[in-house]
Swiss-Prot record:
Gene name linked to the record: coaD
Name assigned to this protein: Phosphopantetheine adenylyltransferase
InterPro entries named among the record's database cross-references: Cyt_trans-like, PPAT_arch, Rossmann-like_a/b/a_fold
Subcellular location field: Cytoplasm
Organismal lineage: Archaea, Methanobacteriati, Methanobacteriota, Stenosarchaea group, Methanomicrobia
Family statement: Belongs to the eukaryotic CoaD family.
Organism: Methanosarcina acetivorans (strain ATCC 35395 / DSM 2834 / JCM 12185 / C2A)
Length: 156
C-alpha cells in the first residue's frame, strides 16, 4: 500500500492546496497520506500566519469535507522542510513548483542514507483568473479569494 507525503503551511486552504491534497489521496489509493504541516517554530514567528493548531483544525475540516476516512491520513508537525521523509519509508511525495526543490533535496539525503528515492509527483500551480498562481500571499493581500477570483484591481 502506497505511503504518500505532502506538506505545506496551509495558511489559507486555497484551490492550489486542494489540488495537492487531492492528488496525494488519488495516488495513495488503499495506502495512507501523511500531511506535513509547518510548525510555528519553523515559521520563525511570522505573525501574519495563523498558529499551528488553527491551521491543523482547518486542514482537518477540509479533509473531513472530502469524506476521507481518518485511517487514510495522518497530519504530522513539520519542524524542518524535509520532515520524516528522509528517515521513514515513503513511496511518493506530492509537490508544487515551489516545493519541488525540497523533494530533490530529500531524495539526495535519502540516497546518502542508502534509502530508495521517493517518486516525485509534480502538481502545477492553479492559476487565478488573472493567469498568475493562486497563493496564500495573494489571498492575504486581498488580491484574490481562495478560488483565484479577483477581489480588487491591483495597484499599478
Amino acid at each position: 500500500m502506497p505511503k504518500v507525503a505532502v506538506g505545506g503551511t496551509f495558511q489559507y486552504l486555497h484551490d492550489g492546496h486542494a489540488r495537492l491534497i487531492e492528488k496525494a489521496f488519488e495516488i495513495a489509493g488503499d495506502g495512507k497520506v501523511y500531511i506535513g504541516l509547518t510548525s510555528d517554530e519553523m515559521l520563525q514567528k511570522n505573525h501574519s500566519i495563523d498558529n499551528y493548531e488553527n491551521r491543523r483544525v482547518r486542514l482537518l475540516e477540509y479533509i473531513d469535507e472530502m469524506e476521507i476516512p481518518k485511517e487514510k491520513y495522518e497530519i504530522t508537525r513539520l519542524n524542518d522542510p524535509c520532515g520524516p521523509t528522509v528517515e521513514e519509508d515513503f513511496d511518493y511525495i506530492v509537490v508544487s513548483p515551489e516545493t519541488y526543490p525540497v523533494a530533490l533535496k530529500i531524495n539526495r539525503i535519502r540516497e546518502k542514507k542508502g534509502k530508495n528515492p521517493l517518486e516525485i509527483v509534480y502538481v502545477e500551480y492553479v492559476m487565478a483568473e488573472d493567469g498568475t498562481p493562486i497563493s496564500s500571499t495573494r489571498i492575504a493581500k486581498g488580491e484574490i479569494d481562495r478560488h483565484g477570483k479577483m477581489k480588487r484591481e491591483s495597484q499599478a
